[in-house]
A protein has these predicted regions:
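Long, low-complexity intrinsically disordered regions enriched in small/polar
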Residues: 1-49
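Long, low-complexity, charged/polar intrinsically disordered regions in eukaryotic proteins
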Residues: 87-140
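Short helix-coil junctions and helix-kink-helix linkers
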Residues: 167-184
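Short acidic alpha-helical/loop segments enriched in Asp/Glu that coordinate divalent cations
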Residues: 162-170, 201-210
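Short alpha-helical segments that sit at the start of domains
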Residues: 125-163
Length: 369
């Protein structure tokens, strides 16, 4: 799966990922205080069940929720605040606030508030609106293990095409999930089905594994180094000379071409040459659009004169990044996981988590191409 999240090659876009000021008063006459009053009102009947210490704790959590909600509204959805007059939005606010009052978990507070901010911003009766409402219902029931498993499953279906340094950051961004992946149980897997986040396709599973997809998508990254004769030919072709660990370019060579070559090829560890980008097709397409057909020829030569990694070598690449990938890859090979598919609300919840981990914006559309 791929999402157009553009990768720069000296101005050429070729990168992809394969998936909240004061008091607010707007035209509807609703202020920040009104929003707090609305939230307090819609959960008042539920709050009445608490006694003594539990009552004080619940009130404190509700105050924390309201404070975070107002802050995010001011930052991200000031123009939409009037929607809190609608019954549908008040019902969503009731469920979100109550979810945090019950758990008291800081992450839950952030998740519920963010969901409510998104809910304010979407069109009523849209598919996105129904997904958000369902997510607000489901999220309180998901244990940390279930939420991390769901997020990892969504991550495992993506392929990122970018600079290798960006790809490595992307892989490393989910280390907090990997560190706990061994705690996932069969009960967690079954519960995701019960919670309507996933479903089983018994007897059917994808023929391509996570490793297959990475090997296919990152076909420049997962290759062995080129032979010395490629290096010599490359330096001779571009008339590059070395002097005291400094590269000298021929007089009259265009600055744009020099910068492009340095952008794509890692020449630091001569006589070894490495690629700085993950994907053959995206690099070649970007260079062709810039008119660098001679550099495209270099990429083709590099590709043809290097051997791809085996699946086992790709696995070792990930395990070297984080030993917990051993558990993660074993998990992905389990029959119960291979036949598991994410439902739309599961994809939605997982995408929101992945944005926090990776920093990449992910569209739901990448899972439905």
């Amino acid at each position: 799966m791929q999402n157009k999240d553009e990768q720069q090659i000296s101005g050429v876009s070729n990168s992809t990922i394969n998936q909240a000021k004061g008091n607010i008063i707007n035209n509807y006459g609703i202020s920040a205080k009104d929003v707090i009053d609305i939230v307090n009102s819609v959960v008042a009947d539920k709050m009445s069940v608490f006694h003594k210490e539990a009552e004080e704790t619940a009130k404190q959590r509700l105050t924390e929720f309201n404070r975070e909600l107002i802050k995010k509204l001011q930052d991200k959805a000031e123009e939409q605040i009037g929607k809190f007059n609608s019954p549908a939005l008040q019902l969503a606010a009731r469920k979100a606030a109550w979810g945090y009052v019950q758990s008291g978990d800081t992450n839950d507070k952030e998740n519920f508030v963010d969901l409510l901010i998104e809910r304010v911003s979407v069109e009523e009766k849209s598919t996105k609106q129904h997904l958000i409402d369902e997510a607000i219902e489901i999220l309180p029931s998901l244990s940390p293990n279930c939420l991390q498993l769901l997020t990892f499953l969504a991550f495992s279906q993506l392929m990122k095409q970018s600079k290798i340094s960006e790809y490595e950051n992307w892989i490393n961004s989910i280390n907090p999930i990997l560190d706990n992946i061994s705690k996932v149980t069969s009960l967690d897997i079954d519960f995701l089905n019960q919670a309507n986040c996933t479903f089983n396709t018994v007897g059917f599973h994808s023929s391509n594994s996570f490793i297959d997809n990475q090997l296919k998508s990152c076909d420049l990254l997962f290759r062995h180094k080129p032979p010395r004769n490629f290096v010599d030919k490359f330096f001779a072709k571009h008339q590059i000379t070395r002097q005291d660990n400094t590269y000298l370019w021929p007089a009259g060579e265009s600055f744009d071409k020099i910068m492009t070559l340095n952008e794509i090829f890692d020449l630091v560890n001569y006589p070894e040459i490495k690629m700085k980008y993950t994907t053959f097709s995206s690099v070649c397409d970007g260079l062709a659009k810039r008119g660098f057909s001679d550099i495209v020829d270099d990429i083709h030569d590099y590709y043809n004169q290097t051997q791809p990694y085996t699946k086992e070598e790709v696995e070792q690449y990930f395990i070297a990044k984080n030993p917990h990938w051993q558990d993660a890859l074993s998990l992905l090979k389990r029959e119960g996981i291979r036949s598991l598919r994410l439902k739309p609300v599961g994809v939605y919840i997982a995408c929101r988590q992945l944005v926090k981990f990776t920093g990449d914006e992910l569209s739901l559309d990448i899972y439905y191409k």
